[in-house]
């Protein structure tokens, strides 16, 4: 379906400009003035700002307790994000119980979020159960489109805690494949 948004004040990295926007499906295909009205739907945005969707780069749809127990908010609540103009969330994905990080990411995207989220969902890996296979998973996560991982130096004496040797080994593996590491 083609949608034409006409006469709005478009705000982007170039600043503000009066312009029309043509959307085909989920993709912006043209921004300009006096675009032809060859669309299934025309929206008059005169007197209004047209902004890109927001990105929430720090979402927690799984709450982690220091005992390693995970509590969940479900992705069907993301309609609230959409109502506020946020079109993408980047959720932290801890190890699901009994799963490695790669399987946890697949589960999160293909089971928990699939068909539930009202916005686009991306993930930060959240290593909450370091094992012998964790280092080998880091490049696989990058290949899957997961650009970052969160590690914990806080919460010593809990399952979340990562000692210096594990932390450094994760950081070295991340450097080799271009993954960003975050430390809490």
Task: State the predicted function of each range.
Residues 45-116:
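Metal-associated gating/positioning segment near the N- to mid-region
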Residues 8, 21, 26, 47, ...:
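Divalent metal-coordination and catalytic microenvironments
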Residues 96-107, 111-184:
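Histidine/acidic-residue-rich, glycine-tolerant segments that coordinate divalent metal ions
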Residues 1-4, 9-52:
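Histidine-rich, glycine-flanked metal-binding segment
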Residues 12, 93, 153:
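Residues that line or immediately flank small-molecule/substrate-binding pockets and catalytic motifs
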Residues 18, 31-32, 65, 99, ...:
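Glycine/Thr-rich phosphate-binding loops of Rossmann-like dinucleotide-binding domains
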